[in-house]
């Protein structure tokens, strides 16, 4: 790697919209995110399942299929 052409990599505080803060590394001074592992449905176990069968039935009814 060439010397002097790469940005300085430093430790930064990442702030989530839910209020959670954690430390990471970046070339930016501060990072703000909308969703993190503390509030994401995959990690919290509060997943919302969309019923695909209901959407298919609605489509079939709309176009007179089946």
Swiss-Prot record:
Q: How, per the record, is the cofactor bound?
A: Binds 1 zinc ion per subunit.
Q: Tell me which species this is from.
A: Geobacillus thermodenitrificans (strain NG80-2)
Q: Does the keyword Transport apply?
A: no
What's this protein's function?
A: Binds the 23S rRNA.
Gene Ontology CC: ribonucleoprotein complex; ribosome
Query: What does the sequence similarity comment in the record state about its family?
Result: Belongs to the bacterial ribosomal protein bL31 family. Type A subfamily.
GO BP annotation list: translation
Q: Cross-referenced Gene3D superfamilies, in alphabetical order? A: Ribosomal protein L31
Signal peptide residues on this chain, from the entry's feature table: none
Q: Does the keyword RNA-binding apply?
A: yes
Its assembly, as annotated, is: Part of the 50S ribosomal subunit.
**Which cofactors, if any, are listed as required?**
Zn(2+)
The gene from which this protein is expressed is rpmE
Q: Which HAMAP family match?
A: Ribosomal_bL31_1
Q: Which residues bind Zn(2+)?
A: 16, 18, 36, 39
Protein name in UniProt: Large ribosomal subunit protein bL31
Any one GO MF term held by the record is:
metal ion binding
The intrachain disulfides are: none
